[in-house]
Each structure stands twice: as structure tokens, then as C-alpha cells.
Amino acid sequence: MGERTPMLKMVGVSKSFPGVKALDNVSLMAYGGEVTALMGENGAGKSTLMKILSGVYKKDEGKIFIEGREVEVKGIKSAEEAGITIIHQELSVLNNLTVSENIFLGNEKHSKFTGRINKKLLDERSKMFLEQIGCDIDPNRLVSTLNVGEKQMIEIAKALTKNARIIIMDEPTTALTDVETENLFKVIENLRKKGIAIIYISHRMEEIFKICHRVEVLRDGKYAGSAEIKDIDNDKLIAMMVGRTIEDQFPYRDVKKGDLALEVKNLSCKEGVKGASFTLRKGEILGIAGLMGSGRTELAKTIFGEYKKTSGEISLNGSPININCISDAINNGICYLSEDRKKEGCILGMSVGENMTLCNLKKYENKFKSLDKKEEAKDIEYYIKKINIKTPNKEQFIKNLSGGNQQKVILAKWLMLSPEVLIIDEPTRGIDVGAKKEIYELLNELKASGKAIIMISSDLPEVLGISDRIMVMSEGRISGELNRDEANQESIMKLAVGINN
């Protein structure tokens, strides 16, 4: 019997952004009537590859074949015309429209006589497509009255109206209940039986082994391999995903740990943290690892007072503290560097100096309640030299600096407050290799001076290379903790996907 033709074949796909090669000669195959898992760590290139397939990005190189015929995907419309649809993690339904209006949005059926939208025909055809996926929702219902699982069914029905042959599902169960998840799996089975190729992106291992037939793995923007699900297990799949060693680029410094600085007990928040408990000592870097949506940033923002805790206690230097807002955290010596420095870490339209002293202006007030510009300038120049911020002068707009230097300015802003606990989220995201090493050296210096540091990172080599201890989160909970000498990428990934035995 001859070799079967895949529904989808992507060959030699590459994509670069300024300073970053996101995809390098990547290939992928998916077969009709099968569910293909697309796996990889955060930043492996999964989203970029799917955005190319669905027409959001244009590839730099490579070819795309559907049922053996080469197609050129020039945009979202041409992808849909080729039978490719993506259902994003963030659903794109419009709450103020009805079910049928959402299903046929942009593809409305008009009356031959009046030219108006034929509402009756929309409802009839919507009902037909919903029945095809075993869904009994009234086409006249407002989408605002539906739960997340039902809204997802609307997206799938919408894909069917476009004659989708390839449906990409990006983390489809993230916001679903167990019952809604089981319903989704039944719908996926119905789609599979129709000969549709499903590309399924998820970090939940149990789902991959339950509903997928094959797995394609990306690693660091490159093709890492593929396998039949029946031929692999958890360990083999994780090894495919992480398969790289720690490099000598991480200048770890072993420092004697001091007294207990921070203690968190049973901390929860409605944004997604569930009963987190941990400790942090002076002179220590605690790395927090986990997949996207695991609750790492939410934990940091709860400690920092940006999110309100629903339960739990926070103690500093052995004494309980109350943190109800960000200023409470800052006044207690806790500072947080956001993962999104341009949106939350700095004000792009202000200068380097203005950003640096923004949180510490009271220090420079004189007896006339105006700023002592001379004293302020002295501190700004000190930190520019101390942490090697490359800027022509303190008046330079921060938006004109490189990512690494922007990060240093934000770090200086908090160091001016002499914090006891520094939480730094994705410290080297979007930063070049040279600047990364400088950031690591800065963190080591702060650790050596007795600062207690929490470092959240999606870069596993970074977590392993810099941290003294590593805490792993999964679905809002702390799934485990590893000492530096026992941790490796596979042990972290097992905890990150909820395998803690």
C-alpha cells in the first residue's frame, strides 16, 4: 500500500523578527481524520508557526501543501479559502450578537429580493452546523448568555461554515470545566470522523495522550521530531521538548544564605493562585518555573499588592505584613519588575532619569516641596554608571534604548528604594545575549549584598543556571520544589505539566 498523503505539510518554514529568528527550517505534517499534537516549551515557536499557517504572519521561507497541492497563504482570508481555521485561546466571539450572527459573521446570507440579511436562513443553517457537532444551542440566544464551553462550540461551528479542512485549537481547555472539556473531546471526535485534520496545542499531557494520534515537537524555533502517540510516553515526550544542556553562559555565584526574608502561607487570589506557600532567604535567588497560565505572574502580583489576596499570609523578616495595594508592598520593601516592561515597567515618553526616580520623588523634596534636581541628578548618574546603562545622557527618552538597557533602568528605579525582596518577571525576555549576562551579574551582586530575589522565567536554562532553588507552578498551584543540584529540565517539565511523582 502506498504512503498516505497528509492533509497538511509544511516544509522548511523560517520566520525572523528584528534580532530574533523565531523559526528555522521547520517542518510539520497533519493527517485528515487525526488529531496532531503540536508541543514545545514556551517560546519554542508553536504560536509563530500556527500564525503563519492561519495567515496572521507571512513566512520568510518554506512551502505549505494541502492534500499534496502547494498553497500560498497570503493572509487570514486566503488561509480560510484554503480550508485553514484557527480557534484561539482568547475566543473572538461578540457577546452583543446572537449565536447565528456570530457563526455567519462576515459571511451573512442575504435575501435575494430585499438585500437584507436573511435571519431565518441564518438560524436554520446555524442550527444545522451546531447539530453536526452535537450541540443543542438556540441560534437566537445572545452569546453573552453562554458559558465558555458553549462559546467555543460557536467558534467550531463557524469554522465548519467556511469548509474548514484543518482546524487549529490553541490551548482549548484552559478555561473549561471538566464537563465542558469532555464535551469538547466528543466534538473533536466528530470532526475527526468527518476527515478534518485537527492540530491541537496544549501543555496538558493527559489530554495529549487521551485524544491525539501523533505529536510534532518544536524546540528553540526548530523541528525537534515527531512520533506516533502509541510509541511514546511522558518521559520521551518531555525529552523531545527540552533536549538541550545548560551552557556556561550563566554566571552562577554561590553565596551564604542569610535569615528568612519572606514567608508566604496559603496565598490565593481570584486571578488564579491557589494556596501557595513558600519561603525565601536573604542572599538567595528563588527561580519560579511553569508553563504559560500556571499562575507565576499572578503569584508575584498578589505579593506585590496588584492583585488582592482572597486568603493567606505574607511575612517579612518574621513579622506578618498587610499588603492591600502596591504602595503597601513598596513601603514594606517588596518590589516587582513586570514581564511587560514597556506596558507596566516604564513610561516610554519619559526620559531615563525621570523613569528612574519616578517611585522615589519624595526623597528629593526640599523644604519648599519642590524637587532638589541636583541631588536627583547625582543619584541618576550613580546608577547609570553602577549598572552600566548605555545611554547618551539621563535626558534620553527610554523608548530609544535597547531592551537590555530599558530593563536596567527599571531595575535601577527599584534599587533606589533599597528593597529587601525583589521579584523580577522574565528578566531577559527580548534582550540580546550580552545584555543577558550583564543582568545575571547584577542579580548575583544583589544576592551577594543580601537581597532576597524571586526570578520568574520561561527560559529553563536561565532558571537552572541562575537559581539557588527552583519552585514549579502548575494550574495555579505549587507543584513542587527542587534544589539546584537535583534540578534539570526534565524534572522541571514533569512538575510543570502536573506529573509530580
From Swiss-Prot:
Residues annotated to bind ATP: G40, E41, N42, G43, A44, G45, K46, S47
Annotated localization: Cell membrane
Location (main, coarse): membrane
Domain ABC transporter: 8-245, 255-500
GO molecular function: ABC-type D-ribose transporter activity; ATP binding; ATP hydrolysis activity
Record bears the keyword Protease: no
Subunit composition and interactions: The complex is composed of an ATP-binding protein (RbsA), two transmembrane proteins (RbsC) and a solute-binding protein (RbsB).
Coiled-coil regions, chain positions: none
Keyword Metal-binding found: no
SMART domains, sorted: AAA (SM00382)
Membrane topology term: Peripheral membrane protein
Xref: InterPro entries: AAA+_ATPase, ABC_carbohydrate_import_ATPase, ABC_transporter-like_ATP-bd, ABC_transporter-like_CS, P-loop_NTPase
Broad class of enzyme this protein falls into: translocase
Pfam name, any one: ABC_tran
UniProt similarity note: Belongs to the ABC transporter superfamily. Ribose importer (TC 3.A.1.2.1) family.
Summary of the function given for this chain in its UniProt record: Part of the ABC transporter complex RbsABC involved in ribose import. Responsible for energy coupling to the transport system.
Catalysis performed (reactions): D-ribose(out) + ATP + H2O = D-ribose(in) + ADP + phosphate + H(+)
Record-given protein name: Ribose import ATP-binding protein RbsA
EC number: 7.5.2.7
Gene for this chain: rbsA
Gene3D superfamilies: P-loop containing nucleotide triphosphate hydrolases
Keywords associated with the record: ATP-binding, Cell membrane, Membrane, Nucleotide-binding, Repeat, Sugar transport, Translocase, Transport
Any one GO cellular component localisation term in the record: plasma membrane
